[in-house]
Structure formats: C-alpha cells, structure tokens
Amino acid sequence: MNALKEYVCTVLLFGMAILSPLKAQSDLEIRKAFEQYGEKKGVVMVELSSEMLDGYDFSLFKSLTISNNPAAGDFIRKCLIKDEAGAKKVKQVVANGKPTSIYLQLPRKSDLYRLILFNETQKPENKITLIYIESKNDSEDILKLILKKK
C-alpha cells in the first residue's frame, strides 16, 4: 500500500510540474505562437522554470528564436495585438510601418509579474525572438537584470 501511495504522489507532483507552465500562459494569445512554432524545424524554443532560474529570480522563462520566417513574425504580431489590450505598459519600436520591437508589461497573475518581449531583425537575416517571463520582481527590475547579465 505504501508503494501505491508513493506512486500516486509522484505522478501528481510530476503532473503539476508539467501543467504549471502550460497554465501560466493560458490567458495569453502568444501561447498560440509557442504551440505553433515551438517544435518546427529551424526554431529554437527554450523553457526554463524553478531551480534552472535561481540566478535570475524568475519563476518561468520561455523563448522562441525563429530564423527566415517573416510569416511567423506577422502571426506573432497579431497575437501581441490581442495581448496588448490587457497590458499595463506598452513600448514599441516601429520601422517601415511595422513594429520590430515590442515590450508588454502584463497585469500580475497572483504574485507574479509577467512580461513579453518581441524583437525582429531583417539584417543580416530575418530573425525573430519572442520571450515570456514570470517573476516576483517588477518588470523594470527584470529588464535591468536581463540587460546586466549580457
């Protein structure tokens, strides 16, 4: 009977660990970008949580890097327009009438600050980066930390 209890507890803990990051973005449109492009050839998706992020004090870090796929950039921008509607702070850099860098500070979820960063460059190649971060730190502190670590 003890082995059964241990097995059930292990399965429950494992399930919670897997479902926690999935639930994190459930209310955001960018979730679709991670789902659609996360496992495509030529795309790098990174998802880190818990102890992997101790030095950064983040709860969740998720990123996509996509090369030579302008359609992905257009799709992500459409997702960001919907997420922007609920954002507390929005900053954009626009080039040739198209947002190339977007920063969204989203409303807190529980005790976590949420932040979306998007960047698209054209030269030397088309490269798209999408980052989603959850942290107990304020989004301004998160940006300072990211820029300092570089």
Task: Give the location of each predicted region.
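Polybasic/polar functional segments that serve as interface/processing modules
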Residues: 23-112, 121-126, 139-140, 144-150
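Terminal membrane-proximal soluble interaction domains of membrane-associated proteins
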Residues: 133-137
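Short, hydrophobic/aromatic-rich beta-strand segments within well-structured domains
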Residues: 114-120, 129-132
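Bacterial Sec-dependent N-terminal signal peptides
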Residues: 1-30
